[in-house]
Amino acid sequence: KLTDMYGKIKEHLQHELAEIEAAGLYKRERIIASPQRAEIEVAGRKVLNFCANNYLGLSDNPRLIEAAKKAMDARGYGMSSVRFICGCQDIHKELEKAIADYFGTEDTILYAACFDANGGVFEPLFSEEDAIISDSLNHASIIDGVRLCKAVRYRYANADMGELEECLKKAQAQRFRIIVTDGVFSMDGNAAPLDRICALAEKYDALVMVDECHSAGVLGETGRGITELYDLRGQVDILTGTLGKAFGGAVGGFTTGRREIIDMLRQRSRPYLFSNSLPPAVVGAGIETFKMLAESHELHDRLVANVEHFRAGMMAAGFDIKPTQSAICAVMLYDAKLSQEFAAKLQDEGVFVTGFYYPVVPKGQARIRVQVSAGHTIEQLDRCIAAFTKVGKELNVIK
């Protein structure tokens, strides 16, 4: 029997859902009937995939699949426990060391997702005596993590070093100060000016934390992220990241950095303490991922070449492209309805992308976000550019 209270909330939710639908903001899941790769099957037809975070093309890599199978055969399907009770195998420690070696840090702690890593990093380390200074375009997980903490909060406009400096001046009375930024911002694809952030952190005596989710595997000479890009390896106090993007695309997050910080997170970070350990298959494939990346940076080099090829082709066609160094290419359309229509027509042309508009991006800043992968061939990139060009002319976006 339904309670009266459920009847009330049901009516309320139905009304809110109808409003979301009417505003064109209702999110529908698009069903993929193939492995995640450069070409996927959607609604019974093959399309080129340009909206996955599969930056190094590893989501269906045979070596990772085999490593996952071997780990599951040797260590089982699941852990059925949190780490500090009976959920820690030798391979969990091996993966944590591999991540620390990759980023040049002292220690690493694994989480179920990077949302948990960001959500669980602030509360154990900072109190009302401290200050967190956060970029305005940081990921939702950072925003939620900061909300869970009692520290004084400051926010500066995206990559605005003048505003950041003003925040640091205001925060001088606090005991501890930390600057928090995404390495690459997911909607524009721009990289944080980490060299200038670290210079200000040194000037005003602050810690620095970077979310490497969209920069690890992508930026830097060998793909080791934004700290490598700016020659700051080992100089950033806290890095967070994911195994769900460049590093195989499955699940799992991590925090890596100073040893004492990681040790305190093991003691008091609630998402770590109260969530099951990562399953052996994911851990085994993760270890294999970092072995592959230690052997060669061929995949990173291919990604860089693909990004350069795609951006050059799109700009030659006349599209308005946000300047970035990342694998995220924001094709600016500015109008919300146009971005939806453009994305739908591209899917008709066999190109799978997503249009983004308010409230995901600011009003008047609608765009199609293209994510390039090392798994794309030059022929696939050219097909995508040709489809964009055809639709762009049909909709009077380009001449």
Question: Language-model segments: which ranges?
Answer:
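Short loop-beta-helix segment that forms the pyridoxal 5′-phosphate
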Residues: 82-88, 97-120
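Active-site C-terminal subdomain of aminotransferase-like
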Residues: 204-207, 214, 219-325, 338
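Conserved PLP-anchoring active-site segment centered on the Schiff-base-forming lysine
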Residues: 121-140
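Conserved PLP-binding catalytic core of the aspartate aminotransferase-like
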Residues: 301-310, 315-350, 360, 364-365, ...
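Active-site phosphate-binding strand-loop segment of PLP-dependent enzymes
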Residues: 154, 158-210
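PLP-dependent enzyme catalytic core of the Aspartate aminotransferase-like
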Residues: 2, 7, 62, 66-70, ...
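N-terminal "arm"/small-domain region of PLP-dependent enzymes with the aminotransferase-like
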Residues: 11-15, 19-77, 206
